[in-house]
């Protein structure tokens, strides 16, 4: 039985019209010639040769469909040899007389059915005749009917041997996982002899003459076998790399950004330029058989040090022990808020406060600066914070604190903010009765009930006397709503945390919230242990923001009982004191410590991923509340709404699993010295260790490691040029850059617009942009159009870009305000190259 020979053909006329004429039996003077085939002369040895004439498909659905059979014909061996090997042509009449009608039916019937021209094998001629226009248009869309050889040359290679190997393997020996680019790369590995260049070829017939007689045809089958073996080895290597990366990342809790960086770095270590070239050398035809016997090679390139850092940095225990740096110093004495400022002066309540609005604060500070010229306070809120932080002042002018109070204080004064009637009041409190107020309005369960009771039961047992409207005076309002200001000049004894956690779904069960609190408590204690000794029953207070009512109380009877009805986010305040003898100083240590807590929680949140997407954010706790001028609402207080209503009461959520008797925990949650940043609840006598530096020494490890692998960016271009050439920028632009720019401008710009650039000056605006101005004036006329009015409002500037240390690319750009020029959008006109060497 004769072997079917595949041949890719082209026509010397419109190919789509030629196909339609052949199918309908119309006279056509055109002819077909061979571009490429899959046989050797010895394969055409029978009396009759069966030819499958094919065309490339524009959008192949798979490897098997890259070229589609158009006609199946039988030719005498001599005619077939002339067509395949000697640039012979087949006339349209020859094809019409010898093509298989059944094969043509199988090829074109699907197209005719889509066009609504369906017919059986005997009516295909009539169908094409009646719908010729649609049929020809469909052929142009389905097949790649190019008339130029340049598409083939640009796609499959510009040299004879590589072109024949790649195109023959692509069309006649389909490999499902290969692309043209892959085959081109493998052809370079397979044969270093590229053959004659194809750049002089101008017609498809010339290209076919070269390809059908090329000696590379004898090597196509061997090349195909090499491609199969090479791709099998590549698949083995890639699967090993993927398996290593996936197994490793499955053990780590990574954010989306960290995950992208980790995968990028892992693949970069395996497939960077040097490693990939070395692997390519090991898998060339000479070495492939030996390499096939070895274990996967590329996966071994993943650096062991990188693996170690990943394994330790993204592990909770090793992260805290290896990557958290603390620096502290012992000092004596260290004073926070005065103790008298945190309690009432009378057993029955009552407080002593100073309050005022921002303008009153400013007026007072101006007066103080006049009377006490050595104090130099800022005459704004910052000055009030500095004044409140004064604990002991030795000056001949005295102490300006008497402007706030005549009471003697043993420490700093707490500064609060309270809102009433859409006004914000700043308060300095010298004696505070809020604990007395809390005892009257918050009812704790009896001590006997607290023995052995579950935390969730205690949470439900606490009763608040809820209020709904703002008070009538500031003195009363600070009982129900106040914010404490963080003072960077004071030591921090209590770690106050603000949790704002987006939740995946609403109506949280109390057990879900309790599990979250347990995770936070464990993470907080792990970090506190780095600072000093911490007991297992160390108190960590949680205050959950009350939910907003979703309906009127009368309509809520039919709704299922749910502890939390929050739908978008869960708000909580978390407060704990630092270990005995430890405090922090300044904003930066608190910020860094909170960042570390966020990371620890993300590393241990595997069981709570259904509650919130922890990995999508930087962490659940706000790190911005420790800056100067930042305040945070006290526990057991309300948020004031837009209309003065009181909402979002911060209620105690009990989480104290290590203690049997939890009544002291409940009582301490009502003590002011346990809830404020700078309040000291322990014996103030004796030296304290002040932590002044907290650092994650490997912070943004993956991001920084990724940046190191990226190409170096030369950002400080102008200083680099001046340093390299030892000359001023102006001299360099006038002597080297502007002559090239002006020559380019002169070649395409009219004489009228060219005159604007006869005398120019240069004004650098940053490290890589230089504005070009006329010698007189600031701007130019539009360089593209003649706008109505023709005002000089166009800015021109040069963008300097260092491609390498000695290769400078200068881009000439302009900005025109006219609508026709897209309203001040920067427009690039041209670029010139300047060699700095």
Swiss-Prot record:
Organism: Alcelaphine herpesvirus 1 (strain C500) (AlHV-1)
Site (Essential for primase activity): 498, 500
Locations listed in the record: Host nucleus
EC number(s) reported in the record: 2.7.7.-
One CC-aspect GO term: host cell nucleus
One Pfam family matching this protein: Herpes_UL52
The keyword Signal belongs to this UniProt entry's keyword annotation: no
Record flagged with keyword Zinc: yes
Protein name per its UniProtKB record: DNA primase
HAMAP family in UniProt: HSV_PRIM
GO biological process terms held by the UniProt record: bidirectional double-stranded viral DNA replication; DNA replication
Zinc finger (CHC2-type): 782-821
Quaternary context: Associates with the helicase and the primase-associated factor to form the helicase-primase factor.
Record GO terms (molecular function): DNA-directed RNA polymerase activity; zinc ion binding
Family: Belongs to the herpesviridae DNA primase family.
Gene that produces this protein: 56
Keyword entries, A-Z: DNA replication, Host nucleus, Metal-binding, Transferase, Zinc, Zinc-finger
Task of the protein: Essential component of the helicase/primase complex. Unwinds the DNA at the replication forks and generates single-stranded DNA for both leading and lagging strand synthesis. The primase initiates primer synthesis and thereby produces large amount of short RNA primers on the lagging strand that the polymerase elongates using dNTPs.
InterPro entries: HSV_PRIM (IPR033685)
